[in-house]
Amino acid sequence: MPRYPFRRFGFGALRRLLYLWVRSETINQSAFTLKIDRSKPVLYVLQQPSVSDLAVVDTECRKAGLPRPVMPVAVGDAIEPAAFFYLTPEPDWLGRQDKRGASPTLVRMLAAVGQNGLDDAQIIPVSVFWGQSPDSESSPWKLLFADNWAVTGRLRKLARILILGRKTRVQFSAPIHLRELVEQGKGHERTLRMVNRILRVHFRNLKTAVIGPDLSHRRNLVKGLLRAPLVRQAINEECESERISQEKAEGIALRYANEIASDFSYPVIRFLEVILSWFWNKLYEGVKVNHIERVQDVAQGNEIVYVPCHRSHIDYLLLSYLLFRNGLTPPHIAAGINLNMPVIGSILRRGGAFFMRRSFKGNQLYTAVFNEYLHTLFSRGFSTEYFVEGGRSRTGRMLHPRTGMLAITLRSFLRDSRRPIVFVPVYIGYERVLEGRTYLGELRGATKKKESIFDLFKVVGALKQRFGQVWVNFGEPIHLDQFLDRHQPDWQDQDLGPEYRPDWLPQTTNLLAKDVARHLNDAAAINPVNLVALALLSTSRQALDESALARILDLYLALLRKVPYSPSATLPDGDGQALIEYVKSMNLLAEQKDALGRILYLDEQNAVLATYYRNNVLHVFALPALIASFFQSNSRISREQLLRFARALYPYLQAELFIRWSLDELDAVIDQWLAALVEQGLLRQENDTFIRPAPSSRQYVLLILLARSVTQTLQRFYMAIALLLNAGQNALTAEELENLCTVMAQRLSILHGLNAPEFFDKSLFRHFIQTLLDLRVLRKDEAGKLSYHELLGELAEGAAKRVLPAEIRLSIRQVALERPAEEAAAESNDAAAN
């Protein structure tokens, strides 16, 4: 080892020879962000003796300007010949190695701090990864080359360097201060054992986070599923219900298991990384990643479940690519069975995808096998990924979460909670979504088509377009044990039954789903396209003078900087004019020049598509827009009135858009927004009353444009309420009301020239009706007919009256009154049938 000058000379020659081939980098710039005190001794610790690992660490230290491990270091009055040691001591001349022994260097350092008065010493754990790959016994190539959990021999190490040396990554971890451990007063021997134990656990957890847990043979894993008690029970029940033999039922279960299970392959991961690196650089202008340190903080020692929003088929690939590039194990990804097609399915499966059917209903054996497979992933520490929205959002909104996968995760955790589960929300924001043209027809009201990976190939002709950037924000993690402690404090002491399906599971799963959706929206990446779409769609003809558009964008940026939506949300750089130039460069804006300047507008195709990008961030602006709405029909309003009516409307906005603030927090947040609007000149305050600007002023126009962001949402609320009140008590079922609302919205969109198909989106009415039921404003009788509380009338004539202009309310009431309920319901049912 290079502890003395002659050896250091030989080591330097070896390092230069090694780097004729090897290329290395630090994971997440960890060498450049170390917080060390250079006035105190710094030593590096590596897990196993390895000259090649040491050479890589020495090179990365030179790059980062850190103290080099092969150089002497002063320890009080003594000099250590080198500033590194191995956790597992080096073998002696006969090749014998005491794996339980302690490094002599560590013993001396601890003695210097504990007994000889040295102020402190800093120990920096360093890990070198020659490629990243979970081990799989079925692949001799992986066993020979990839970093894994097996003991590494010299021949294998050489092969690994030759095969994987150009993809070498180094992780520098935070320093361990020996002074802090010595001050615990446990004595030299116990402190030494404690330091060794801390380092062993650290290296094990880091290795799990970076290369994944030790994978067993896939064939053994699949067969192991069939031996699980719950699967055995399902097999026996299948035999009885279908009157088939045990062997045949086991064959069916085995077929299900093989259909489901992923087959992680390091060569495929590396292949995809190369392809995707080219793809992002070719198609997009880079990927901006924010808050990934949150994942790195929780990856060690926890089971990570990534829950991204779902906007595009490339979401699957993007997240795995980013995690791999940042030194984290790509997750096992839940994918729809429709993607398990020849060639594509095999690549996805080897890239970590496991496949699931859209519905498990009526197939208890499949359900048992799938649940057991997920439980195996969770209990063994494999990170996983699934989309709580179910499918891709065609409207740009956060879809209402599907609770199936969350319920399976919850039940698995109740079954075995030894390994904590942490949900990591991931917001993926595109400035131009790849499937935009596919979504365009659906936004115009065409029937939703079945999802297929081949949708991606339909956009090949559009690859000459500029797609801008992709933004990936990691949200605030949700610790499942802490979530259960809040909502079911005695969950660990309850008798959960043989299937781990307590009575409170459905309600708790729904609460978890809403939490995940809100955390996803909290991490919104607000980009230039979102803001321009929001501004132009708030005008009557989707057009604005360029200088006016720049002022609106500057206003939006100023408001969001004054009252940030959440610590996880991000804003674009630049001012309003810079944002306009950027969006123009993407050919999303049309322009017309005249003597007074330039008018920017959205053509018909881009106007419909712009609703998608506006909807990405509608939840961010919903509350200030609601506040602004109170001044469309009122020149002034007291704070007390505004708060009262806002409290009445907010629960419905929150339920539809998954807005982050609770009702208890609402008053304080509204006060912040009122102060921001006053600061920007959009409101004026006199004592406890807020006054809008003069209608002829520029500030008034800005205020009204802000209010229009949520006008269509409030109109839909008012429509449903007006139809209910007009029909009377116990006259309509929820389904009849939903259909009636859809027909009415379609008619209003024709009458008022609204080019926004989502205005009559049936699912939005369905969820609004469900929210009214959840809040007990509506009730169902035995026949399913709806009765309403007197609060409904107050909502219509109190709150709605103050946020919707009189002409809009009149138009809605006229349409509701002109059509007898029975006739409209019949027509709506005909429309539904067609």
UniProtKB/Swiss-Prot annotation:
InterPro entries: GPAT/DHAPAT, GPAT/DHAPAT_C, GPAT/DHAPAT_LPLAT, GPAT_PlsB, Plipid/glycerol_acylTrfase. GO terms for biological process: CDP-diacylglycerol biosynthetic process; fatty acid metabolic process. CDD domains: LPLAT_DHAPAT-like. GO terms for cellular component: plasma membrane. Its EC number is 2.3.1.15. Keywords: Acyltransferase, Cell inner membrane, Cell membrane, Lipid biosynthesis, Lipid metabolism, Membrane, Phospholipid biosynthesis, Phospholipid metabolism, Transferase. Pfam families: Acyltransferase, GPAT_C. It is an enzyme of class 2 (transferase). GO terms for molecular function: glycerol-3-phosphate O-acyltransferase activity. A motif (HXXXXD motif) lies at residues 309-314. It is found in: Cell inner membrane. Pathway: Phospholipid metabolism; CDP-diacylglycerol biosynthesis; CDP-diacylglycerol from sn-glycerol 3-phosphate: step 1/3. It catalyses: sn-glycerol 3-phosphate + an acyl-CoA = a 1-acyl-sn-glycero-3-phosphate + CoA. Belongs to the GPAT/DAPAT family. The HXXXXD motif is essential for acyltransferase activity and may constitute the binding site for the phosphate moiety of the glycerol-3-phosphate. This is Glycerol-3-phosphate acyltransferase. The gene is plsB.
